Design a protein with these regions (language model features):
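Contiguous, often N-terminal, cationic amphipathic patches that form binding interfaces
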Residues: 1-73, 77-94
Length: 94
């Protein structure tokens, strides 16, 4: 069975929530049934299927966010939240 495409918001909507330095705050749910990025009440909620083991969930979050932004995963950097659900990610300049 093919993996369903994740539900992703437009890149402009995600970039609009970043601060002046291009940092985006995320709330992550690892081990979810489906992968998605939602914007709710001015917050970015990310759900990934990967379990939080050996950084697998963090890698999945960056890959999903990169897909939503149309950027390479290597251009995104996790600044804070390596072991928590609240994360701060540095986005590349638009």
């Amino acid at each position: 069975m093919a993996k369903p495409r994740p539900d992703l918001p437009p890149p402009a909507a995600l970039r609009a929530l970043a601060d002046a330095e291009g940092r985006l705050t995320l709330r992550v749910t690892p081990g979810a049934r489906t992968e998605s990025i939602e914007i709710a009440e001015g917050r970015v909620l990310v759900k990934v299927r990967a379990k939080p083991h050996d950084g697998a969930a963090n890698a999945a979050v960056l890959a999903l966010l990169a897909e939503a932004l149309g950027e390479a995963t290597s251009r995104l950097h996790l600044l804070r939240g390596a072991i928590g659900r609240d994360k701060l990610v540095q986005l590349p300049p638009a």
